[in-house]
Structure formats: C-alpha cells, structure tokens
C-alpha cells in the first residue's frame, strides 16, 4: 500500500513538471508570436512611412500642406511692420535695424572675409536720406534716369561672358572678363537686397552693389583686404556710401604696418581724390560700354590708374625673401 502511494506521488510529480514546462513553452510561444506581430507590424509601418504609403493618401494633402505653409507665412508677415514691397523684402522694426547694425558691424570688423557680414552692414547703414540723395543724383542725369527706368541686372547670362572673352583686348568688356577670370569670381554672387523698405531705394542700392566689380576691374584692383579698402574709399568719396566710409576708415586698423603704409601713403589718397573728381559712378551704364576702349573710358570718367597693387606686394615679398636669405647665410 505504501509502495503504491509512492508510485502515485512520483507520477503526479512528473505530470506537474510536464504541465509547468508546457505552460512555460506556451507562454514563450505567445510572447514570441506577440512580439513578431507587434515589431513586425512596426517594421511594416516604418517601411510604409519611408515609402510615403502610410499617410497622405488623400489627394488633397499636398494642397493642405501648401495652405498651412501659406498660413505660416501670413502669420509671420502679420508680425512685420509692413507688407513686403518687393520680392525678397523683409521689413524690419527700428529696434531690429539697430540690432542688425550693431551685430553686423562687430562681425564685419573682426571677420571682413565673411561676405554676409558686409552685406548686412551695408543694408543696415543704407539710411533713407543717403539713398534718396543717390536717387536724386541719378534723376539729375540722363543716363541715370535711363538706369532707373530700365532697372538692369548685372548677371553673367546678360553680360554674355563668351562674347566678352572674344572682344578685342583693349576693350573694357575684355578687361572685365579677364579680371573676373583672374580673381575667380562672378557677378552672379552679389546678394539681393533684403532689408531696404523703399523699392526704388532698394534698386539703387542693388545697382551700387552689382557694379562693385566694375570698379575693381577698371582699376585692376585685386579682391584682397587692401583692394577692397581702396575700392571702398573710392565709393565713399564718389557716392557717399556709409558702409564704404566705415570700411576704409576702420578696416586698416587691423592690418599690418606695411599694409597700412601702402594704403595711407599711396592708395587711399588716390581713391579719395579720384572719387571726388571723377564722374558719379552710379550714373554709368556699364553694360553699354563693354565694347569701348578701356583707356578712353577711364579718360571720359576722369579716372587715372593707381600703382599696381599686386606688383607692390610682390616687390616687398621679394625684398623680405632676400633679407631672410642674407640673414640665414650670416
């Protein structure tokens, strides 16, 4: 009887263990199946989202997205002091203009190589009274009035670089083409006007900005810090550009003594004298003068070429090299 009881207990124990294992396996299988379903579904959802098939099946979704974007733009424009008055115009409040002037001024002083700093400072200092005076200068001149009426853009496709490259070497157009090639720049890199409110003032400032490279090419001044300061002094004396005045007065303070000596001794006096005595450059229709003899153009404008800045820099560099070699030999 006792032995039968032991056998019964042993059988029950084995049955219980089997049931526990079976329950464990069933639970594991259930978890695995659930995970496969859940994570497999997530993977399918992710794939569908990646293919753009999960949502946006409504044909009007693109329209809804465009409407939302337009609403955001309208909400932003409602926070501006006025409606934009031309393409790309961003109206600013007075305190925003003052902040733009302060920040761009500091950045331009310490990082003049960053073009965006110069662009922002230029517009921050383009006061309406200055722009109106420049506009009146154009209205008082027949060519200036045509420029205001035509509102031309200085771009490579309009200037036709291929045509300029085939002009006679004595023409202004060929001189301009070779200068662009030598300096590895393009007229297309000039930034559009953004923060000037009056549309005509905005064009006047854009015209000044787009013609900047013509002044470089006409006087064969390179795009280096010294060359930029010289052109800024010319623009300041000729057109009264506020940012140009700040540029030629403050930028030399950060240069080496040899550079300052060249500027103060030779180039700034030339730039200021030339700017004060030559024809107002804002009234020059450069696009119509590309086939003109470059020397005749300089004479008509009242511009005499400055000393070759590249040659002066190369001469000093060669002198320093000779002195270093002499010192090393001794």
UniProtKB/Swiss-Prot annotation:
Hydrolase as UniProt keyword: no
Topology of this chain in the membrane: Peripheral membrane protein
Pathway recorded for this protein: Cofactor biosynthesis; ubiquinone biosynthesis
Family in the record: Belongs to the COQ4 family.
Biological role stated in the UniProt entry: Lyase that catalyzes the C1-decarboxylation of 4-hydroxy-3-methoxy-5-(all-trans-polyprenyl)benzoic acid into 2-methoxy-6-(all-trans-polyprenyl)phenol during ubiquinone biosynthesis.
PANTHER family: UBIQUINONE BIOSYNTHESIS PROTEIN (PTHR12922), UBIQUINONE BIOSYNTHESIS PROTEIN COQ4 HOMOLOG, MITOCHONDRIAL (PTHR12922:SF7)
Protein name: Ubiquinone biosynthesis protein COQ4, mitochondrial
Gene field: COQ4
């Amino acid at each position: 009887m006792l032995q039968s009881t032991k056998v019964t207990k042993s059988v029950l124990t084995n049955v219980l263990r089997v049931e526990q294992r079976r329950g464990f396996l069933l639970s594991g299988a259930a978890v695995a199946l659930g995970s496969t379903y859940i994570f497999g579904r997530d993977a399918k959802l992710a794939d569908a989202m990646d293919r753009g098939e999960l949502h946006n099946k409504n044909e009007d979704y693109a329209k809804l997205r465009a409407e939302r974007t337009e609403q955001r733009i309208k909400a932003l424009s409602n926070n501006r002091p006025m409606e934009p008055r031309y393409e790309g115009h961003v109206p600013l409040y007075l305190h925003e203009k003052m902040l733009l002037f302060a920040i761009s001024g500091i950045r331009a002083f310490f990082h003049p190589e960053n073009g965006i700093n110069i662009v922002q400072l230029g517009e921050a200092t383009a006061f309406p009274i200055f722009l109106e005076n420049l506009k009146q200068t154009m209205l008082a001149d027949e060519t200036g009035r045509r420029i205001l009426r035509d509102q031309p853009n200085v771009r490579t496709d309009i200037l036709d670089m291929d045509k300029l490259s085939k002009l006679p070497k004595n023409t202004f157009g060929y001189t301009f083409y070779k200068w662009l090639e030598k300096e590895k720049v393009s007229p297309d890199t000039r930034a559009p006007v953004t923060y000037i409110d009056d549309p005509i003032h905005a064009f006047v400032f854009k015209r000044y900005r787009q013609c900047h490279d013509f002044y470089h090419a006409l006087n064969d001044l390179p795009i280096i810090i010294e060359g930029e300061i010289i052109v800024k002094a010319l623009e300041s004396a000729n057109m009264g550009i506020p940012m140009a005045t700040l540029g030629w007065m403050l930028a030399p303070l950060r240069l080496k003594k040899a550079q300052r000596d060249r500027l103060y001794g030779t180039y700034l006096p030339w730039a200021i004298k030339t700017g004060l005595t030559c024809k107002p450059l804002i009234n020059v229709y450069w696009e119509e003068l590309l086939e003109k003899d470059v020397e005749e153009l300089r004479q008509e404008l009242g511009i005499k070429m400055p000393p070759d800045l590249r040659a002066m820099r190369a001469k000093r560099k060669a002198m320093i090299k000779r002195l270093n070699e002499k010192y090393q030999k001794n």
